[in-house]
UniProtKB/Swiss-Prot annotation, chain A:
Gene3D superfamilies per UniProt: Nucleic acid-binding proteins, Recombination protein O, C-terminal domain, Recombination protein O, zinc-binding domain
InterPro entries per record: ARFGAP/RecO (IPR037278), DNA_rep/recomb_RecO_N (IPR022572), NA-bd_OB-fold (IPR012340), RecO (IPR003717), RecO_C (IPR042242)
Annotated protein name in UniProt: DNA repair protein RecO
Native source organism of the sequence: Thermobifida fusca (strain YX)
GO cellular component, one term: bacterial nucleoid
Organism ancestry: Bacteria, Bacillati, Actinomycetota, Actinomycetes, Streptosporangiales
Function description: Involved in DNA repair and RecF pathway recombination.
Keywords: DNA damage, DNA recombination, DNA repair
Family annotation (HAMAP family): RecO (MF_00201)
Pfam families registered for this protein in UniProt: RecO_C, RecO_N
A single GO BP: double-strand break repair
Ubl conjugation recorded as keyword: no
Superkingdom in the source lineage: Bacteria
Family to which this protein belongs: Belongs to the RecO family.
From Swiss-Prot, chain B:
Protein's GO biological process: DNA recombination; DNA repair
Function: May play a role in DNA repair. It seems to be involved in an RecBC-independent recombinational process of DNA repair. It may act with RecF and RecO.
InterPro entries, A to Z: DNA_Rcmb_RecR, Rcmb_RecR, Rcmb_RecR_Znf, TOPRIM_dom, TOPRIM_RecR
Family to which the UniProt record says this protein belongs: Belongs to the RecR family.
Native organism: Thermobifida fusca (strain YX)
SMART domains: TOPRIM
Name of this chain's protein: Recombination protein RecR
PROSITE patterns associated with the record: RECR (PS01300), TOPRIM (PS50880)
Domain annotation Toprim: ranges: 79-174
Keyword Glycoprotein: no
Gene3D superfamilies associated with the record: 3.30.60.80, 3.40.1360.10, 6.10.250.240, RecR Domain 1 (1.10.8.420)
Gene of this entry: recR
Pfam families to which the protein is assigned, alphabetical: RecR_C (PF21175), RecR_HhH (PF21176), RecR_ZnF (PF02132), Toprim_4 (PF13662)
Amino acid sequence: MSLYRDEGIVLRTQDLGEADRIVTLLTRRTGLVRAVGKGVRRTRSRFGARLEPFTHIDVQLHAGKSLDVVTQVDTLHAYGSVLVTDYPRYTAGVAMLETAEKVVSVEKDPALRQFLLLWGGLRTLAEGAHDPRLVLDAYLLRSLAVAGYAPALEECAHCGVPGPHREFAVHAGGMVCSLCRPAGSVKPSPAAVALMVALLRGDWESADASAERDRTECSGLVAAYLQWHLENGVRSLRLVERA
Amino acid sequence: MYEGAVQNLIDELGRLPGVGPKSAQRIAFHLLAAETADVHRLVNALVAVKERVRFCAVCGNIAEETQCRICRDPRRDDTVICVVEEPKDVVAIERTREFRGRYHVLGGAISPIEGVGPDDLRVKELMARLSEGRVTEVILATDPNLEGEATATYLARLLKPMGLKVTRLASGLPVGGDLEYADEVTLGRAFEGRRALDF
Ligand SMILES: [Zn+2]
Ligand SMILES: [Zn+2]
């Protein structure tokens, strides 16, 4: 059984040789897959547009020794063509794709919840109903939660005593009580913490009503938390633009 | 593994883009069998490219003097600038003979995942050229793929307050490809049919 079919989202592409491209996919059933798209940089290739980042595809692959080979591909949704017309949404989307790859990290280990989360995140971003930075932060928090790194926001990350607490320590795992608080804790505004809670729960009504300065603070906390938990960090986060 | 010099050569060749271990080995043995004079010509060409070739101070294209051939040509139209990613895109567009204006080579596309942002490209240099006031149209001819489109979107937004005509090559260029692979006819048509961007 060397041929298999799956559904996936293109996370990243890298040029290979003269006209080929390596695509990294997060698939519904197989998890993270790296595969070669042959000849896709040639302008006559019908595959090219379908193997661009952000595309949700139905794909048939031939399992190879090191890399699989794409043998057939159909577009289910081309989120990229919408996102690319709006720079803040595009950069938020790229940070989501990069995070998905780094959070899942192991190839061919099924990660259905991560796939569904990314798909939902890209759909929300493409619909454009919310501030792209909020959509990104919601995605980052939930993606970490699915991976087992949910920040403690309503109880102390160290001893578990119920809050509300005033201080946040990235390396302790979230909010900390006054007895547990390690050196280097920061004191975020209660509104920024409430925004993180809303984003983690999917409470868009509260999130959309948040003030700009709380969004900025929330993004800072989420970014610090993400960079701490992902070994190599998420490079594209630095280039995300505010709407 | 081969001994010393041969293996060294195979390793060096293998680091070139598009050359796998098998090709590297094939090229190495070809050179080993070739006439000494032929190999010296290749060596000289390699050294010359590093010693003589630099980037045009005006547009960023490949040049053998301070300015490239196109920037030095007084017959070119100063009112139109075509923005491309790489010097090889200039070559592709010149082949169409459709364009008589000037170029601006960015040195790549915005690629957040590779850590390449607007500050890593020759965007400031472009803005400086435009602020001189002679240019009336900017053609965004970045690659017809996602990163090229995103770069065009970024530039269009940046250029908007300047009140210039900003155009993008007409689609018909296959999406997902590299500009350099487009044939002359398709690329020429894309130039003729370029559309104004209104952001
Ligand atoms: Zn505690
Ligand atoms: Zn020049």
